[in-house]
Design a protein with these regions (language model features):
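Conserved "HGTGT" condensation-loop signature of ketosynthase/thiolase-family condensing enzymes
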Residues: 1-131, 139-145, 151-207
Length: 207
């Protein structure tokens, strides 16, 4: 059984986060305007978790674990690289664009910011990504590989995401939810039953 120490959530008003909101996120975390949009959305949920709980980047146990879950991941960066492959000769494509688009990069950015050294995972998929991510968190807590684990779910706005939503209704709009989970029963029980989207998961566990 898992318990929730803190939670945060952020979402766009019309499927996308406002530019001013993203600017505030970048300012809070010292991010460049060139930072991948997915990372900015991801950190937006972390900023809300900080604001709601009074925690900050120095509050985490250094052995804490991390899971970043997403249905599409940093699809904007992946698509940018694919577009360059189509538009330019292979030797003119920026390798750095692809290097920064791998699905593990957002998790790496969070571990650097929080200076946590526990197990870190990236989980991606559609129908059972959310369930798999939470089961992975529970397994790590039960095994004692980390005293607490930060689970962040995020989606960025994209043409691909819009197309997916037409055929897969549970697909989330541009949003992110963050949960700091523990096996310590002094905190409220983490509720997951019958939940298929980030916002519902957040509202079920906010106190």
């Amino acid at each position: 059984m898992m318990y929730c120490k803190a939670a945060g959530y952020i979402a766009g008003t019309e499927n996308r986060l406002d530019a001013a909101v993203l600017k505030n996120i970048r300012r809070e975390f010292g991010m460049s305007i060139r930072s991948p949009r997915f990372n900015q959305v991801l950190f937006g949920a972390l900023a809300d978790l900080f604001a709601r709980s009074g925690l900050n980047k120095d509050s985490f146990d250094k052995s804490a674990g991390l899971i970043v879950g997403s249905r599409l991941g940093p699809v904007g960066m992946v698509s940018a690289f694919q577009n360059e492959i189509l538009d330019y000769p292979e030797d003119q494509v920026m390798a750095g664009t692809f290097a920064n688009s791998v699905h593990n990069a957002p998790a790496g950015a969070v571990t650097v910011l929080l200076d946590i050294r526990g197990p870190a995972f990236s989980v991606m998929g559609f129908e059972d990504m959310l369930e798999q991510s939470l089961k992975l968190a529970e397994l790590n807590l039960e095994a004692g590989t980390c005293p607490e684990i930060l689970v962040i779910f995020a989606e960025e706005s994209s043409i691909i995401g819009d197309a997916v939503k037409e055929v897969y209704a549970p697909f989330d709009k541009e949003s992110a939810a963050a949960f700091l989970l523990t096996a310590d029963p002094q905190y409220p029980e983490f509720r997951t039953e019958g939940i298929s989207d980030y916002h519902t998961l957040f509202t079920a566990n906010i106190r």
